[in-house]
Amino acid sequence: MALNLEKKQEIIKAFATKENDTGSCEVQIALLNERIKLLTEHLKANPKDHSSRLGLLKLVAQRRNLLKYIKRTDHARYVVLIEKLGIKDR
């Protein structure tokens, strides 16, 4: 259920703003987005797994807060990021 190392490195490479960048908002949001996708698939197969559902809600809230921060500080980065990830603009 967790991201494997290769997938995580692939996401970091795709969204990094500079070399060895693992902590920028773009990278964090992309990693959260992938974890949210995995948890969503898990919950489709296991609808009674309430602890995973709560974890999913926490991840979505964390992603939403990071997206709000990027939107507030640099709107151009925000637009590019949501287009790359395929997230709807609220």
UniProtKB/Swiss-Prot annotation:
Question: By what name is this protein known?
Answer: Small ribosomal subunit protein uS15
Q: Which family does it belong to?
A: Belongs to the universal ribosomal protein uS15 family.
**In terms of domain of life, where is this protein from?**
Bacteria
Q: Choose any GO biological process term that the UniProt entry carries and state it.
A: translation
Please provide the record's keywords in A-Z order. Ribonucleoprotein, Ribosomal protein, RNA-binding, rRNA-binding
Presence of the UniProt keyword DNA repair in the record: no
Q: Which GO terms describe its molecular function?
A: rRNA binding; structural constituent of ribosome
- SMART domains registered for this protein in UniProt: Ribosomal_S15
User: PROSITE patterns given for it?
Assistant: RIBOSOMAL_S15
Coiled-coil annotation reads none
Subunit and interaction comment = Part of the 30S ribosomal subunit. Forms a bridge to the 50S subunit in the 70S ribosome, contacting the 23S rRNA.
Q: What does this protein do?
A: One of the primary rRNA binding proteins, it binds directly to 16S rRNA where it helps nucleate assembly of the platform of the 30S subunit by binding and bridging several RNA helices of the 16S rRNA.
Keyword Membrane set for record: no
Q: Can you name a GO cellular component term?
A: cytosolic small ribosomal subunit
- Extract the NCBIfam families matched here: S15_bact
